[in-house]
């Protein structure tokens, strides 16, 4: 069937910012789809609000709009561009919901835009719980006993019929937003209220819990001629009841009999045929472990997180082929790009095992609610490939970067068995490691199965891993046992611990006895057809399939799983670095382990090694490939942390030298440099004991910022105002010691400024300077950044330019450098220098059209910036105003305080651009999910130190027509300043403010921290109530000021004559 010739221009909707439940997998899918449509000769227009993606690069689509993903903005683009068609199934839930809104409002019809891919009626049939259930009944496919509710009362009526436990699933949401498992009336009321709030259709499905069934997924493709195939099937190790995005997953499934596999395969294909899916689709099923009974849980009629995993697990490019199916091509006429010889209608076959483990943000949010359920909490994931289940699991564990290298916890032996069992029953993010610990203590597999319902197949594999540990201990230094442990994925580090040797000794022993990994190709067909994909995984077997060429090579280390503080921005830089290496005539090799990203698409680099980012795994690749060198500055802290160990082993670190990377991090050396080049920094000291920290703080004068050295994303960083708070910090957050010094700095209040620069050793170019809206003290990743600066004087800009140039040259930077400054009342101070790519690189690259990561890579390979046509210093400004606004995922993380501070909390970002600051901010705030209204009610409750400043904001909000509610102290202050205000009761009193928030009477909350960070504090409850009821809550008066500017610019002031 030839492609659709009636259309020329296609609008693609992206998925917007990275949030929990919708991460980098959509950048990967969108990039693939846009390129596939261009390959077929269509003109592609892309709209997405996320500047950190490869997808929003000008090369990917013919026209790129970085605008808010709201009905109004997309409708404007449709009216302006007049596309022939819209492809909505590649932008996650956001893209789907937008398509439905644009259709319902008549925008598509009135502009003659047709929807490509799966028809809207099919999308609604899959997403609307009522329609889906009735279709399943017609097909005679069992669904769990359930009811559709639009009110809490209806939910209680259903509970009377079936009893607890119940699962609540809101319609048209993703990542299980607003859903959950309920065991009692209190939970049912809370979850249903939440779920109805988050569902665009105010509709929830309530079903009898089938927790404990096996959860199986099929990733399927269908075209318009009804050809349908299964690309990959996957099994969740955790039974039904934990969101698949939070489950440990294995592919292909390991515990199904052939009869069960075929039965569920047939059901999956029957369902997508009945729905009329055209493209990729994910089907989730529950199978009773004790019979052939099964239920269908849900169908995602779009490309999803699971399809990114299936693509990387098989090499079969689902999003690319889904885009081509959408324009009318069929599976039997498209070649599989991996083999180049077989057609896309052949189902992939795997001769290896894939393990996926989610990456959770609880290293950042220690007080967060860790228990897992149907609402997703992971920010990212890792994948590993092995020849046995044990090998792939252990490789995935050491890819997580939790400081865990094996099936157990770092200080596992210190826990007593009762505590371990309690944690296993709790089913949280560390359960897997506690299971390992329990087996180590001799707990029977029967007892663990009883507690977890995890299949014996997997429990036996865990037991096998523990058995190998015992064998190693009993046969220290034995080569046969060493080889056996390597076959099952043990790292040298773990073997060393059992052998009572150092890691280097085990490494040496291995090499002397020629025990080293070979690299196998991922070819989609288990070697049934000829294939030549440059996509490899390491394993301890015989034949090496990775042919080493005689071209000069450069290895780029990726940034691993998406987490808070290290997002898709680093993947963006990695991909650009690879393109620059290829353009310079070298062979570019990527090592990474994140299945969601563009960098792990095998068509990007000359070779892709899907391996853990550890010294051992990376060294094995270096030993084989013998590269010119390794690039670490694009992979975030993950790659930087490997630099020292690699250099010790004689590896050439390309770009800024290891010595200079360390100079930027080492307190004393950095201070010496600043004195030499005459750049001021806030007074600070290093403490190696709690006593010394107190002494330092008193000498410098409070408030001080305290933090451990060598961290990314401001982990464990705090501003403290007195001895008691400092003592508390040192006891709870960081044990200060000679190995782990704590930095104590004077906290300067002032405007924070961020600068990115590129240096080739001689010339320093500064693509742009960004000014933060929130004053210093809020982490740069959580601040709203503005380009070009709006309030800096010419003199300030000259100083920033001069300091940046001095720092880049003083540190002998080759490549990128990111610097944060504070402009205090008495001048500019340097706060922090990062000698690597930063999270603002994609944002600045897009604004200025300076391909920063590529230029940095060219400088690293020895080219001169002056030869490339760049003048030194600050580059000319781009016209317009651009803001980068943070996006948070607090609605998915219970018990997490949303107050902004030095520790980063946002999961993603959006960009707003326009001709004035107010318009750009309006777009940035809108894109980040803050609905800016020109009237409404604002609730203000601030700490004493903020009251004077708050009066000014309240006065302006009142003048544009906002009604003001405030708690007693704040209300008194406002009344004293003649501002109309209504006093609301404190929490727990009559007419309390939480009730006002829950009843939807409040549109904005302004709440600043009162010291004494106990969770019970009222402020915490106010902030959480805001998040859980979808009300924007501003915890910084700077943000409140900016929002007030925007509201003023939208409305007219009303003043009497």
Curated annotation (Swiss-Prot):
Q: Where is the ATP-grasp domain?
A: 133-327, 671-861
* Positions that bind Mg(2+) 4: 832, 834
Q: Which domain of life is it from?
A: Bacteria
Organism this protein belongs to: Staphylococcus carnosus (strain TM300)
Known catalytic reactions: hydrogencarbonate + L-glutamine + 2 ATP + H2O = carbamoyl phosphate + L-glutamate + 2 ADP + phosphate + 2 H(+)
- Give one GO biological process term: 'de novo' UMP biosynthetic process
Among its keywords, does the record have Ligase?
A: yes
Binding-site positions, Mg(2+) 1: 284, 298
Q: Record-annotated residues binding Mn(2+) 2? A: 298, 300
Gene from which this protein is expressed: carB
Query: To which protein family does this belong?
Result: Belongs to the CarB family.
Q: What is this protein called?
A: Carbamoyl phosphate synthase large chain
InterPro entries in UniProt: ATP-grasp, ATP_grasp_subdomain_1, CarbamoylP_synth_lsu, CarbamoylP_synth_lsu_oligo, CarbamoylP_synth_lsu_oligo_sf, CbamoylP_synth_lsu-like_ATP-bd, CbamoylP_synth_lsu_CPSase_dom, MGS-like_dom
Domain named MGS-like: residues: 930-1057
Its needed co-factors are: Mg(2+); Mn(2+)
User: Recorded E.C. number(s)?
Assistant: 6.3.4.16, 6.3.5.5
Which free-text remark accompanies the cofactor? Binds 4 Mg(2+) or Mn(2+) ions per subunit.
**Which annotated residues bind ATP 2?**
707, 746, 748, 752, 777-780, 820, 832
Give me the residues that bind Mg(2+) 2, please: 298, 300
Residues that bind Mn(2+) 1, according to the entry? 284, 298
